[in-house]
Structures are given as structure tokens and as C-alpha cells.
């Protein structure tokens, strides 16, 4: 997910996307702990980075709203 795409989203949409990605991350980690090999081991890393990106841009937006 690109930062420009995230910046176009509203805060509510960002929150929904964060919940969705965290759920997907929990499922992937669960599969890993059960011994199932992942199709693409980079999935977990990419999910974590997407969540961090979403949280960062959400904080930026909230800061902007506070200044206005």
C-alpha cells in the first residue's frame, strides 16, 4: 500500500484497514505457529510495514486537525 493511497483515505477508513490488516497478521502468525509453511514468508513483514505506514499517516492527519 502506497503512502499516497493512504493519504487519500479518511481516518475512519484508515482505522478499518488497520483492523483488517491486524486480523490478517494474526491469522498468518497462527498458521506459522501451527507449523504450516507460508506460501510467501514476506507476507508477515509486509503486513507489519503496512500497519506501521497506516498508523504513521493517521497520526499525521490527527496532528494536522489539531493545529487547525
Curated annotation (Swiss-Prot):
One CC-aspect GO term: ribonucleoprotein complex
A Gene Ontology BP annotation from the UniProt entry: translation
GO MF annotation terms: structural constituent of ribosome
InterPro entries: Ribosomal_uL29, Ribosomal_uL29_CS, Ribosomal_uL29_sf
One Pfam assignment: Ribosomal_L29
UniProt entry keywords in alphabetical sequence: Ribonucleoprotein, Ribosomal protein
Keyword Ribosomal protein among record annotations: yes
HAMAP family to which the protein is assigned, alphabetical: Ribosomal_uL29
Family: Belongs to the universal ribosomal protein uL29 family.
Name of this protein: Large ribosomal subunit protein uL29
Species this chain originates from: Pyrococcus horikoshii (strain ATCC 700860 / DSM 12428 / JCM 9974 / NBRC 100139 / OT-3)
Lineage: Archaea, Methanobacteriati, Methanobacteriota, Thermococci, Thermococcales
Amino acid at each position: 500500500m502506497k503512502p499516497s493511497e493512504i493519504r487519500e483515505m479518511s481516518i475512519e477508513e484508515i482505522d478499518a484497514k488497520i483492523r483488517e490488516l491486524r486480523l490478517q497478521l494474526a491469522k498468518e502468525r497462527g498458521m506459522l505457529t501451527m507449523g504450516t509453511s507460508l506460501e510467501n514468508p514476506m507476507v508477515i513483514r509486509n503486513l507489519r510495514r503496512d500497519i506501521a505506514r497506516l498508523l504513521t499517516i493517521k497520526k499525521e492527519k490527527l496532528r494536522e486537525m489539531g493545529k487547525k
